[in-house]
Amino acid sequence: MNYEFIPLHKLGVGKVLLRYSEIVLIEPTRNEYTRIDLSFGDYIIVEEGPVEIFRLIKNAELLAAAEEEITQQNNIPTP
């Protein structure tokens, strides 16, 4: 998982835009830039500082893992 923090206080908002995504490909280009392809991603606007942001991310990851486990348990055939 790749996390990018974009402070919005420069725009007068005072919040942080957190972008998270999975990186598929990273390669240099002819113009000395880097091309990054993302398989999926999303944005969250948060007011908390970085420590609280990572706490929110961890909670979201734990919730996703729990939901996946429940889904797998429901797909197991009963004898």
Predicted features and spans:
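Eukaryotic intrinsically disordered, low-complexity regulatory linkers and tails enriched in Ser/Thr/Pro
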Residues: M1-L17, S21-P79
